[in-house]
Amino acid sequence: MRLIARAPVDGNYDAAAEIKLMGQAITYWREPGEAGVPPIFSFAGSDNIARADVLYPVPNRLDEAGLEAFAYRGRVVFPIHVVASDKTKPARLVMTLNYAICDRICIPAKANIALLLPQSGESPYRAAIEEALARVPVPLAASDVASKVAIDAESGQAKPQWTVKWHGSAAAVDLFAEAPEGWAFDTHKTVDNTFTLTAAEIPAKETHVDVHLTVAGADKSYEFSAPLTMPAGAQAK
């Protein structure tokens, strides 16, 4: 595991945490699915850093002993957007990362690492960082959601269910759903660019929720928030 970075643009840095995994081992996305734990980043102790925001490349949907995991296999690079407190002075990024490495068994891992961010010059890690940034979903503006996505409630289902149709120019290969604590949603592809979204767990007496959806494409992915109202007569079990 290592930290890499390139010289700043307009005083802001692009760094990244790179994890290389052996064999068939995996590590998890921010929403790990039915198994696993998400990575936890901390930048406490950094010098001349106003903020550091971790970006998450789109994961793969993987089978882990019969459970669905949203994870990465082989290698993953998490971009980190860094804003210096004083852009005229050097910045030192200190990172603690707690994560899991899973193959036949899961092992907790922890990395403590620091990097003096480069202030100028060409970085040998530029291509790796740009490749990772290209795998991060693009936030979809609220004004664009209606034209690119159709979400329709399905009646007569045992559990609350919606059909999600993607109308973007690029094909959608997968859909991931994130929800507040107490909620859980399953997603499955039915036909090209069409998915079912099913509420598997609902807190008692709750009828509305904002779900964060990630539409994964082969070349470009998007993420957006979708307000949902539970269809009448349906109930998660």
Stretch-by-stretch model annotation:
Residues 1-237:
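Extracellular/lumen-exposed scaffold segments
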